[in-house]
Structures are given as structure tokens and as C-alpha cells.
């Protein structure tokens, strides 16, 4: 762990508070990790020990952080033996957590119309960011989510109007609806009320509906698979709006020591290699996906 991050990343023996399973081997895990909960910001993640038999931790994005209750929520999909073992945890079990790690999203006040785009396991940071933005009256978040497997929540028709949303696209995330945050869903799987296509195409459709003068108020934030992030960056370029993307990358140490997660990033001084774990995971889309 580098000296810069030593005082902001905590190791905690977190107690499992709840563990809910959804379709397609997706889980929402709530952990008692008060230090992490107090310091987490949207876009940061935790490095978990899935089981004592495995030496390597797994990075998981934080979906919610409740400082008052000292808890964090993470959403994950079982891929590989490590997360399969994590899925066996029940309330009362303990999980070693290292976090929060990483630089998160930084909304800019001059662009209060925030477009949040999440795909698959890239959904959690968007929920976290939406929760923080709704606490401030000046921000106007719109959350768009895409998935090709059943969503990790029970979608329902929205009662919040989203001007510019394609006709019939009414499915939403209930939690966001309860917060008063508008959301819409996209999928190629033909789920009721969802936009039939990629979530980035839904984002483009909504941006197209805006008066060109309104684009100066919009900033995009995205998290998901690399192919989705490239598409989000292209949409942002097309409409001339800034976009921050949260990258997904394989990690070993996750605290900047091994540089195993380094990616090429364009900087004013030229190309550079940046560590996704501590230099990111959030970067300007133009730096990661230049024209």
C-alpha cells in the first residue's frame, strides 16, 4: 500500500448483515464495515476475501454506503470459484474487507443534469452516485441501466415522467423510484417496459431529445464492460458533453503496489500508464478512449 493511500484504506473484519440472491446468480451483500462506510465515495470499491482458502481478494464496487449504520452494500455476479464461495456466506459470517479504494466520480456544479449509465455489474456505482446526488437539490440525475440477464432487482413501471424517453420505455429500479430519482432500463432480452437495445443507444435517444442549448448542462457518468464504456465515450463525443468512466480491470493487490491493473491513458504530457485501482477506477473518457 502506498503512503498516499495508507490513511484512507481500512482493513475490517466485516460481519455479513444480509445476503440476498437474485436471478442469474446475482447477489447483494450487506456488510458491517463502519470505517469503509464513512469514507466511501461513488466509484470507490472494496477488495474482499471471498474465503479463507483463497489467497487472492476480489474487487467489488460499492453500491451503497450508510455511514450512520456503518454498512456497505455490494452487488456481484458469481463468476469463478472465488465469488461462488462468497455466495455461501450467511448473516453473521465474517468477510475481510479492504477499502474504500480508488478515486471516484466528481460531478461538476456547472453541469447539474447528470446522466448516469450503468451496464451489468457496472450498475452499483450508478446507484451510489444517484443516492449522493439526490441529497443536493441542484442536481438532476437520470439513471439508465442495461442488462442482458434479469436485473438484480424487481423492475416495475415508473410513475416519474422522463421527457425524451422513447415511447413505452417505463421500467425502472424501485429503489431509485422511492428516492424520487428517474430511471429507465434497457435490454436486448425483451423484458417488459425496457428499451429494446443497448443502454448507450437509450442514452443517445434521450440526448437527441434535448434542445442543443441544454447540452451545456449535461455530464455523463458510466460504468460497465469495456465495450459499453467505449460506446458511452462515443456518445459523449457525438453530443459534445464530458463523460467520466469507471473501468473494470483484473487486480492483484488493488492498492497500487503491483501495477497489474495498469492501463494506457492520454495526458497533457503524452501517453502514460495509470493504475486502475488507485489512479482510477474513474477516468475522463477522452483520456481512456481517445478519438
Where are these regions (language model features)?
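Local cysteine-cluster metal-coordination motifs and their immediate loop/turn environment
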Residues: 125, 226-228, 248-282
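Active-site/ligand-binding loops adjacent to catalytic centers
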Residues: 162, 276, 291
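FNR/FR-type flavoprotein reductase catalytic core
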Residues: 84-245
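Ferredoxin-reductase
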Residues: 2-91
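A charged, well-structured terminal subsegment
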Residues: 280-291
